Amino acid sequence: MNKITINLNLNGEARSIVTEPNKRLLDLLREDFGLTSVKEGCSEGECGACTVIFNGDPVTTCCMLAGQADESTIITLEGVAEDGKPSLLQQCFLEAGAVQCGYCTPGMILTAKALLDKNPDPTDEEITVAMSGNLCRCTGYIKIHAAVRYAVERCAN
């Protein structure tokens, strides 16, 4: 099988990799780059566990081919930390109790980050709509919503 070369900005670093054209972006990130925050949940783009920020928008990587990432900018949870410490948004998730098993957390945080990067003062409805593509079986959604609202308030102060 022919290989393809993918050039991308991954977590702030220019990266290049040769891979199979039928490889999913999820598998490229996990297997080839070792970015294990990107989780496989449903494999249908419905649960949000595999969410990354792709050119500024949250996308599910289980339904994307790796080749679609050529010349793109991708942020995973590994790229969100600030100087090796949890970002403000990550801290807010912890402090609001929005983390239990943690499986959905990377996708939740990246979806929230994409929202707040575009709209630093979203309404409650905008938060609910933005987070609707991410499923959680543990905490429910009240604490997750509260964590995003808490981050908005802390950034305003």
From Swiss-Prot:
Cofactor list: [2Fe-2S] cluster
Cofactor binding note from Swiss-Prot or TrEMBL: Binds 2 [2Fe-2S] clusters per subunit.
Disulfide bonds: none
Residues involved in [2Fe-2S] cluster 1 binding: 42, 47, 50, 62
pH dependence remark: Most stable at pH 8.0. Unstable at acidic pH values.
GO annotation, biological process: nicotinate catabolic process
Keyword line: 2Fe-2S, Iron, Iron-sulfur, Metal-binding, NADP, Nucleotide-binding, Oxidoreductase
Keyword match DNA-binding: no
InterPro entries: 2Fe-2S-bd, 2Fe-2S-bd_dom_sf, 2Fe-2S_ferredoxin-like_sf, 2Fe-2S_ferredoxin-type, 2Fe2S_fd_BS, Beta-grasp_dom_sf, Diverse_Oxidoreductases
Record: residues binding [2Fe-2S] cluster 2: 101, 104, 136, 138
Enzyme class: oxidoreductase
Record-listed E.C. numbers: 1.17.1.5
GO terms assigned for molecular function: 2 iron, 2 sulfur cluster binding; metal ion binding; nicotinate dehydrogenase activity; nucleotide binding
Gene3D superfamilies: 3.10.20.30, [2Fe-2S]-binding domain (1.10.150.120)
Activity regulation remarks: Reversibly inactivated by selenide and sulfide. Not inhibited by cyanide.
Pathway(s) it belongs to: Cofactor degradation; nicotinate degradation; 6-hydroxynicotinate from nicotinate: step 1/1
Subunit structure: Heterooctamer of NDHM, NDHL, NDHS and NDHF. Dimer of heterotetramers.
Biological role: Catalyzes the hydroxylation of nicotinate to 6-hydroxynicotinate. Also active against 2-pyrazinecarboxylic acid, but inactive against other nicotinate analogs.
Protein name as annotated: Nicotinate dehydrogenase small FeS subunit
Gene expressing this chain: ndhS
